[in-house]
Amino acid sequence: MVLTGATTQAVFWGTRTILQMMEQYDGAVPQGVAVDWPNYPKRGFMLDVGRKFVPIGFLRDYVKIMSYYKMNCFQIHLNDNGFKKFYGNDWSQTPAAFRLESTVFPGLATEGAHYSKKRIC
């Protein structure tokens, strides 16, 4: 087997193609030539953690899953607030969340459901 690619990322994704083929063929790789490239320069997924918090470990696992499927963009929607018109035009009753720790605005992050700088890095 020979695997080539124009970049190290291309070679890595080539290994994902081989692993995916092995899943389909019970651990074997069929004989032949495979030429593989993405149809789109950006292949990604958006996850809304502003409305529904998920642990940082889940995000890290998701990055690995996305890489397996050759996705190269991960947009994480980190903050959100509801529409005050649905809550009696009262911002204090409107659901809101901010998921990043801030040293400039320390009280902004949602208590118990945010990503600290230490955990992200």
Model-based region annotation:
Residues 1-121:
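Feature activates predominantly on carbohydrate-active enzymes
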